[in-house]
Amino acid sequence: MSKVDVVDILKKSDALLEGHFLLSSGKHSNRYVQCAKVLRFPEYAAEVLSTVVEQIKDLDIDLVVGPAMGGVIVSYELGRQLGKEAVFTERKDNTMELRRGFEVKKGAKIIIAEDVVTTGKSTMETKRVLEALGGEVVGVACIADRTNHDIGMPIYSAIKLDIQVYESDECPLCKEGKLPVVKPGSREFKELGM
């Protein structure tokens, strides 16, 4: 297989957005990655995630688990390429849970699958659920790693993105006043009352 140009695929699928964005953390950014735009094309999903499979194929994984929503398709595609079972966690009453009759065998080696890892919040919530059920989380696999800090486990990604993030009161885009702020993504903004 030839080397996968992840940035090219992100651009071709309109997943790498430029502008003025309000993130779920309440911070602002000039770029945003909307991986759902990549995942709508099965061939792009397979191609991009093949780069992640190359990094995790020797980890002796038993199970791939993706937090809903962003991790559902990612976990399925990683599981398909690895030949492993793929399931997902989801929120019920604002708490991450493993539902729908899915199970974790005690001692199972698990990779968490995400579309984008930024703060690691849903990853860590999922990790706690899986460890409470007796699983051993060996890392997180994702399309885009946007972290700027250690989340306490290895991250295996198709691409590492260094995207500037600003506190809302220090945002140069707000100060310029040229671009309206846009709220992308899917997580609710409870802290901001939106």
Swiss-Prot record:
Cofactor(s) it depends on: Mg(2+)
Top EC class, one word: transferase
Residue numbers binding orotate: 118, 146
Pfam family, one: Pribosyltran
Known EC number: 2.4.2.10
Record-linked NCBIfam families: pyrE_Therm
Record-given protein name: Orotate phosphoribosyltransferase
Lineage: Bacteria, Bacillati, Bacillota, Clostridia, Peptostreptococcales
Gene, per the UniProt record: pyrE
